[in-house]
């Protein structure tokens, strides 16, 4: 069990039952005793432990009834074996090249430490063949285009989409791409619409904060071009923003409001993976991020209550798991179904 506070409210998340609920101090004390016993605490031990904490007999009797009911609930909850299933999605690195020189790029500024390379038609088509051959017959399959900057090899993207639909007309495919947003054009956006693409644009905050981390390799900032492209096309296409949080860029609410104003329909935040002292997240940055997450979580829940589709999506997977009472056996599907 995990106990935590939000504002002046106290909560318990039980990883066994996948329930999250508000608790008072007495309930928390009783649940901690229950958990510490291996969820096998008897009435005598519970009474003794609660009495030692100063609770009266009436309160103890109520807590005993609550724990007895919760114990029965826990016993009915089984962690089923996570049986590996067949492949469902594949990520195509269509370009090991990039026009940006991001300071912390895990891909070595796009080329992964080698000479810039573009994927060939043959490799892309073989990858689609492999995906189909390794999948369940009736399952929708996902093709993800990645890089480097995948739009540098834009012709291959459309060839791959055409190949998947033409060679496998009885299979359903979804398509997605993560791009830096600098190379968007009318033809590409129209094709995104036609084929139902999900498009994420990588950003590092807005304005000078973004430009400090994500300049062009030729020099100069890239944010103004991205901003122009998003505003131009967002009225007709639902772009998503994926913002990287660094030590110099950790004001979630400020960036969220700016991304919303630009026209993004989905907004995600992810922490930087770097040991660079100039950008890695320190305790001060993490505290700012926690505060921002709480503010955005409140907005997220308000939008759900009002029947709206939330823009802030960072917490969506976790909230969906809790609301559906499901459990994720692994944090990432790479090497399993992906």
Regions found by a protein language model. Name each.
Residues 1-29, 313-338:
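Accessory C-terminal segments flanking Radical SAM cores
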Residues 2-22, 49-91:
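N-terminal [4Fe-4S]-dependent radical SAM core
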Residues 38-51:
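Short acidic, hydrophobic short linear motifs in intrinsically disordered regions
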Residues 84-85, 89-122:
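Canonical Radical SAM [4Fe-4S] cluster-binding loop centered on the CxxxCxxC motif
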Residues 111, 117-118, 212-220, 283-284:
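Short glycine-enriched, charge-decorated loop/helix-capping segments at active-site entrances
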Residues 124-144, 153-274:
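Radical SAM/AdoMet-radical enzyme domain recognition
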Residues 147-148:
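Active-site neighborhood of divalent metal-dependent phosphoester/pyrophosphate hydrolases
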Residues 278-338:
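A C-terminal junction/extension of Radical SAM enzymes
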């Amino acid at each position: 069990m995990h106990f935590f506070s939000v504002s002046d409210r106290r909560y318990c998340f039980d990883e066994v039952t996948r329930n999250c609920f508000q608790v008072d101090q007495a309930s928390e004390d009783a649940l901690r005793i229950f958990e510490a016993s291996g969820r096998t605490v008897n009435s005598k031990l519970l009474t003794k432990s609660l009495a030692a904490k100063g609770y009266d007999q009436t309160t103890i009797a109520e807590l005993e009834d609550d724990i007895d009911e919760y114990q029965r609930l826990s016993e009915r909850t089984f962690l089923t074996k996570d049986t590996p299933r067949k492949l469902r999605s594949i990520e195509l690195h269509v370009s090991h090249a990039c026009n940006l020189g991001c300071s912390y790029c895990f891909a070595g500024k796009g080329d992964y430490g080698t000479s810039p390379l573009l994927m060939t038609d043959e490799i892309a088509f073989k990858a689609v063949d492999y995906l189909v051959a390794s999948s369940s017959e009736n399952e929708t399959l996902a093709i993800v285009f990645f890089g480097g900057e995948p739009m540098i090899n834009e012709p291959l993207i459309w060839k791959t989409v055409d190949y998947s639909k033409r060679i496998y007309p009885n299979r359903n495919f979804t398509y997605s791409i993560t791009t830096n947003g600098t190379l968007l054009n009318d033809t590409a956006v129209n094709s995104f619409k036609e084929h139902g693409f999900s498009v994420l644009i990588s950003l590092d905050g807005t304005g000078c904060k973004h430009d400090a981390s994500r300049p062009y390799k030729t020099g100069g900032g890239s944010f103004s071009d991205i901003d122009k492209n998003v505003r131009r096309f967002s009225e007709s296409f639902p772009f998503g923003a994926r913002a990287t949080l660094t030590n110099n860029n950790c004001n979630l609410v400020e960036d969220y409001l700016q991304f919303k104003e630009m026209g993004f329909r989905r907004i995600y935040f992810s922490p930087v993976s770097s040991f660079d002292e100039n950008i890695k997240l320190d305790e001060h940055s993490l505290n700012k991020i926690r505060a921002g997450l709480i503010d955005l979580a409140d907005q997220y829940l308000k939008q759900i209550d009002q029947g709206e589709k939330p823009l802030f999506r960072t917490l969506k997977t976790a909230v969906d798991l809790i609301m559906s009472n499901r459990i994720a056996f692994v944090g990432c599907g790479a090497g399993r179904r992906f």
